[in-house]
From Swiss-Prot:
Superkingdom of this protein's organism: Eukaryota
Protein name per its UniProtKB record: E3 ubiquitin-protein ligase Hakai
Family, similarity comment: Belongs to the Hakai family.
Gene3D superfamilies xrefs: 6.10.140.2210, Zinc/RING finger domain, C3HC4 (zinc finger) (3.30.40.10)
Organism (species): Drosophila melanogaster (Fruit fly)
Region ranges (Disordered): 1-37, 417-473
Subunit: Component of the WMM complex, a N6-methyltransferase complex composed of a catalytic subcomplex, named MAC, and of an associated subcomplex, named MACOM. The MAC subcomplex is composed of Ime4/Mettl3 and Mettl14. The MACOM subcomplex is composed of fl(2)d, Flacc/Xio, Hakai, vir, and, in some cases of nito. Interacts with shg/DE-cadherin.
GO MF annotation, one: ubiquitin-protein transferase activity
Residue spans of biased composition, Basic residues class: 9-30
Record field: compositional bias (Low complexity): 430-440
Zn finger (RING-type) location: 180-217
Biased composition (Gly residues): 420-429
Residues spanning the membrane: none
Length: 473
């Protein structure tokens, strides 16, 4: 019997202890045991210890079963349960069951389970106390490091943010400290008088309704508030840190510099040299313009000089020039139709030709040829007049028109010499001027038209044709 009980007490398939549990669980892999399973295991261990006191093998079997069923919490409390004295009824039942057969042992064990439940109340209370002590420690969270924002920490939440703040200063980059003229204290907030722009501290500026500025006694319209470091003061006439001088204030360095340039910098007198240069530049276009008033006066003076330098007979012929100069203008085309048709300078037709550039194709070489031919035909006075005209600055359109006009006048002198109506004085004058001809190469025109005064109109026409060929050569 003992050997059979020993065999039944060992192994995995023990009948009484395999109840409510699957097979195949190894040592140390048991399920978590609740309070009822711990009480059942304690009762079974107590009964086995009492029934098998004489057999050491059964004690080993009971210890193995306790090791399998209980975890660390159960192992700490199980020795206390084993040491407790069992009731007398339980001892008697265990002693009586020792003489019974194994077949009737299982119902007896089931009957013996309820009495030890009364003693398990102390075990459950002690276990509850132990769990409560450890629960306080298990509720503490281990420190974890994460990038998730968990909000402000607890010490920051305990802070109060509704404190009253009193600012005692303001951070300004290198401020210039000025003192108030009324209270002699450094100015932290400026009271700026408008429009005189003098400053005091804001308290003194608004202390009473000020009608005038205490510094300059000007009328004050309003007081403007400005912060420290925003005011730029003019120190002209005084020191930087003193209270004398201009002491006007501006809100930017640019405005302050404009005030200094306007109020305190003396305006420099304009230089005297550019004025004569400007006057010379203004007079230069007048000199270059042949139709201008200045050149007209100069030409008039030159004509007076040339008239005074010629003989009396020549001056008489020159005096008749205004009468003869009207012939090409009033008498149609005639002898000099191609050249005399050019209007005199200053007239409306000449201005129109100058605008349209009708005679711009003539070159300076042709102009000099015409002047040389006229100088050879005319007397010394006329040649000197042409030389004075050539000294002027050649302006293309007007100079050509001017030279052609005087060439037509010279041609009219030649035709008037051959006209019988001109009288002996005109013929005598031209005959007297004949020795002044430097060369006789143009004798076909000169002697036939000038000597004797008996040449008729075709001779004058031939001279006009010759001038026309010289003009367009």
């Amino acid at each position: 019997m003992d050997t059979e009980e020993v065999k039944r007490g060992r192994g995995r398939g023990r009948g009484t202890r395999a109840r409510g549990r699957g097979r195949g669980r190894g040592r140390g892999r048991g399920k978590k045991i609740d309070d009822s399973s711990i009480a059942d295991a304690a009762a079974l261990a107590a009964s086995s210890c009492a029934a098998l006191e004489d057999s050491p093998g059964r004690l080993d079997a009971s210890e193995d079963s306790v090791m399998q069923e209980l975890d660390k919490d159960g192992e700490l409390e199980t020795p206390g349960a084993l040491e407790e004295p069992l009731p007398h009824g339980a001892l008697g039942a265990v002693a009586a069951s020792g003489n019974m057969t194994p077949a009737t042992q299982q119902p007896q064990v089931l009957q013996q389970v309820p009495p030890p439940v009364m003693s398990q109340t102390t075990i459950s209370l002690s276990l509850a106390r132990a769990v409560d002590m450890e629960a306080d420690i298990s509720q503490l969270e281990a420190p974890t490091f994460t990038t998730l924002s968990r909000g402000p920490p607890e010490p920051m939440l305990r802070l109060k943010w509704n404190h009253k703040v009193s600012l005692i200063g303001e951070k300004v980059l290198n401020p210039m400290i000025h003192c108030c003229d009324q209270c002699d204290k450094p100015i932290l907030v400026y009271g700026r008088m408008i429009p005189c722009k003098h400053v005091f501290c804001l308290k003194c500026a608004r202390a009473e309704p000020i009608k005038s500025c205490p510094r300059c006694t000007d009328k004050v319209l309003r007081v403007e508030q400005s912060g420290l470091g925003t005011v730029f003061m003019c120190t002209h006439g005084g020191s930087r840190y003193g209270s004398s001088g201009c002491r006007r204030t501006y809100l930017s360095q640019r405005d302050l510099q404009a005030h200094i340039n306007h109020r305190h910098v003396a305006p420099q007198p304009p230089p005297l040299q550019p004025q004569p240069q400007l006057s010379a530049m203004a007079e230069q276009p007048k000199m270059t313009d042949l139709g201008g008033v200045g050149l007209g006066l100069e030409l008039h003076k030159q004509r007076k000089l040339s008239e005074s330098s010629v003989p009396i007979s020549v001056s008489a012929s020159i005096a008749s020039r205004p009468v003869l100069s009207r012939l090409p203008l009033t008498g149609g085309v005639g002898n000099i139709g191609s050249i005399g048709s050019i209007p005199p300078p200053g007239s409306a037709a000449a201005a129109q030709n100058a605008i349209h550039g009708g005679h711009s194709t003539l070159t300076l070489a042709n102009l000099t040829r015409i002047n040389n031919a006229n100088a050879q035909e005319c007397h010394q006075g006329k040649a000197s007049l042409h030389h004075t005209l050539k000294k002027g600055t050649p302006h293309q359109s007007e100079s050509v028109a001017d030279a052609s006009y005087y060439s037509s006048v010279l041609a009219s002198f030649g035709s008037a010499a051959g006209n019988p109506g001109s009288g002996p004085p005109g013929g005598g004058a031209t005959a007297a001027a004949q020795p002044a001809n430097p060369s006789g190469s143009h004798s076909a025109v000169g002697p036939g038209a000038l000597i004797g005064g008996s040449t008729d109109a075709p001779t004058g026409g031939s001279s006009g044709n010759w001038q026309q060929s010289q003009y367009y050569r």
